[in-house]
Amino acid sequence: MKPIIVSVAGPSGAGKSYLANILKQNHSFQEIVSTTTRAPREGEINGVHYHFIDKDSFLKLEEEGGLVEKTYVNGNYYGVSKSEPLRLAKENLPIVLVAEPEGVKQVQKFCKDNDWINVSIFVNSPIEVLIDRLQSRMKQELENVKKDDPQYEQKIKKITDSNIGRMNHIKEFELKNWVEPAYSKDSIFDLVFDEFNKKNEVDVINKVKSEISRKQKLEDNIKKTSKVKKNRIKPF
């Protein structure tokens, strides 16, 4: 069976990581751990949520051709090292990856170059839902900072600035550059969901699995057709 990568993209707060976690925890998917140059947030663990490295190390990895995809968002680099999918592919289980839309294009190229199957998904939500989720996330992060922490003020400011930056990024960039193209006739995505939450969770998961099956069958048919044509060629 060909390796499968399911790429999940969408605006901040749409539920990309939530979908990836469900596929991983309940449906035997493996999740790629991305690499980033941004600092860890409260509660994030190196090697679990991200591989946290400095800018020079990231750029060196890129220069050596060691990245599947990379993006630059809010002053930080994000990417996936080639070693991650190649390692996970040995387990013969589908792989899920959360990426920005530009990163999805790069993953699609990686899959095409390596003869892998790719399913690209875009998860959206109404703008008011996105903002509400980010505000709730910010509130939770702020509550996790202990008041007796010597760096309390700095951490509060960092969390606040980061989340406000993400909210502004949604309004000023993501809606026009990510959401609108996802719904266009030239969309790069196989599946686009207007919203993802507990109410439609089962339906979304079923559609993702159906799309994987459809692409697997398509690959099988191509393989069979190629084999038949090969057998029809008579030697001179």
What annotation goes with each model-predicted range?
Residues P11:
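P-loop (Walker A) phosphate-binding loop of NTP-binding proteins
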Residues A14:
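ATP-binding Walker
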Residues S17:
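Walker A/P-loop
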Residues F29-R41:
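Short beta-strand-centered segment that lines the nucleotide-binding/catalytic pocket of NTP-utilizing
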Residues R38-G103:
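ATP-dependent small-molecule kinase phosphotransfer cores
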Residues P94-P101, N114-M138:
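Conserved phosphate-donor/acceptor-positioning beta-strand/loop module used by diverse small-molecule
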Residues Q140-R232:
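Small-molecule kinase domains that catalyze NTP-dependent phosphoryl transfer to phosphate-bearing small molecules
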